Amino acid sequence: MSVNIAYNMDCMIAMREMPDNAFDLAVVDPIYGDVTAGGYITGKSQGGVGPHPKHHDAAWKQEKTGADYFKELFRVSKNQIIWGGNYFVKEIARDSQCWIVWDKCHPEGIKFADAELAWTSFNSKTRIFRYMWNGMCQGMPGDGTKMQGDKSLNEKRIHPMQKPVALYTWIYKNFTKRGDRLLDTHLGSGSSRIAAYTLGLDFTGYEKEKIYFDLQEKRFAAHSSQVDMFLDGWAVEKQLTFDGL
């Protein structure tokens, strides 16, 4: 049975205690840094800058992730996928043949970024994932280029840097194999954790802000309870999914 666990702690403290190559793949979304006074980068949700959500009491941290973080990340993981890698060219200081492009399928006239980039350590071709993600306009299961008609099925936003579960599911299907151990150092909304749980992958995540940790715990509990209700059927689907990789 797979292990899926999250910790409310600073990932730097945790990584310093880890052995080399503790994880097969780290899929991370470190803090890009403040780009405007009084705002934050919303790279995961809108691709632009906006005010802090009113229902969140904790202040969003603005400090850009430093080189020490990447040094530890490369030490504790065999491969890496780093969202916002274009912001960290100097800190990463490594070439990449395989970038991931997330096309958000924005309609014309939207002022936010059309896509987000992820640096990867893989020696393969650049890959594109297309999935609509603009406010209430979210992609449909099975065809992310088309808008979900029933808004009640949309993912609820609980973090300013949230990415869709579908994106992490696609990443895991294309860049992992059964038995891999996954790391997320900036857990945020927990989308990465949910995708790993559904696919039966070992996962460890860290989130130091308690308000976001608690929100993702609640979200994960709701999702995992639904999955567990249909465990036998899901097990068959998981096996078929990985057999097709």
Spans of model-derived segments:
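A short glycine-rich, Lys/Arg-flanked "PGG" loop and its adjoining helix->strand segment in the class I
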Residues: 63-79
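Short, well-ordered alpha-helical scaffold segments within catalytic/effector domains
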Residues: 8, 12, 66-70, 165-169
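Conserved SAM-binding strand-loop segment of SAM-dependent methyltransferases
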Residues: 3-13, 229-231
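A short acidic, glycine-rich active-site loop
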Residues: 52-64
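Sequence-level motif detector for i,i+2 pairs with an aromatic at +2
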Residues: 1-4, 114
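Class I S-adenosyl-L-methionine
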Residues: 17-28, 32-55, 74-245
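Short beta->alpha connector loops
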Residues: 10-13, 63, 85-87
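Generic secondary-structure boundary/loop-capping signal
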Residues: 9-12, 57, 116
